[in-house]
């Protein structure tokens, strides 16, 4: 259903920086097989998720919204991507960001009115969820880059307390202010993905000792 929606709407909304439908389907089929075989499943088993293009994924480009990083393919996953995979998520692709989550505007349009901005910098993540192209997504905020797109696109966005979600493998902008965050269409959806990502990570020196508490 998500891929059908993307085929219909992506030419207008332009939420994706990178999308491989065949790979997305391969992940979904593998999730189906795992379920049929009675193997253990995670809290996001088979759920389609998008990741902002400033967060590393080993099997997809991460270009930070910049021509300077065109074609860049990280050798390893970010902590966020690894946690999502371990939870069973289907990582659909990478969502559009302004350049380095700061400067040159991205191509994404507001799905409710294509003449309007979806907000930035996490524009693709918010617009894609609002347009039903994915169920959940991950963005980031240094100034207002999570809460602004959520407001503009009419969905729920959660920017948690600093040090709650690991930034290991995320393009840095301002260390004291960089926050990963999540988008969903319901509060229950936000809680589901946030619980997966709120895990202490020694690779991020600013992580709280018990990020899931409180």
Where are each of the predicted segments found?
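Gly/Ser-rich catalytic/binding loops embedded in alpha/beta enzyme cores
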Residues: 1-143
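Glycine/threonine-rich beta-strand-loop-alpha-helix active-site module
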Residues: 131, 142-168
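Conserved hydrophobic/aromatic beta-strand scaffold that supports enzyme active sites
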Residues: 25, 155-157, 182
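Residues forming well-ordered secondary-structure scaffolds
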Residues: 75-79, 122-123, 153, 185-188, ...
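Short, solvent-exposed loop/turn segments at the edges of secondary structure
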Residues: 120-123, 150-153, 160, 174-178
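A short helix-breaking turn/cap at a secondary-structure junction
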Residues: 159-214
């Amino acid at each position: 259903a998500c891929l059908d929606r993307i085929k219909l709407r992506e030419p207008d909304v332009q939420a994706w920086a990178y999308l491989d439908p065949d790979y997305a389907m391969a992940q979904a089929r593998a999730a189906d097989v795992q379920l049929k075989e009675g193997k253990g499943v995670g809290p996001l088993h088979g759920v389609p998720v998008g990741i902002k293009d400033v967060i590393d994924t080993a099997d997809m480009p991460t270009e930070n919204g910049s021509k300077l990083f065109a074609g860049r393919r990280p050798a390893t996953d970010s902590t966020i991507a690894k946690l999502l995979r371990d939870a069973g998520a289907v990582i659909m692709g990478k969502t559009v960001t302004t350049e380095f989550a700061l400067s040159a505007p991205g191509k994404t349009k507001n799905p409710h009115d294509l003449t309007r901005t979806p907000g930035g910098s996490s524009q693709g993540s918010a617009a894609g969820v609002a347009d039903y192209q994915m169920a959940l997504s991950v963005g980031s905020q240094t100034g207002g880059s999570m809460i602004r797109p959520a407001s503009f696109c009419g969905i729920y966005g959660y920017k948690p307390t600093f040090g709650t979600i690991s930034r290991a493998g995320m393009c840095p902008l301002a260390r004291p202010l960089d926050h990963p965050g999540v988008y969903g269409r319901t509060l229950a959806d936000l809680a589901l993905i946030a619980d997966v990502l709120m895990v202490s990570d020694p690779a991020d020196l600013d992580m709280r000792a018990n990020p899931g508490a409180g």
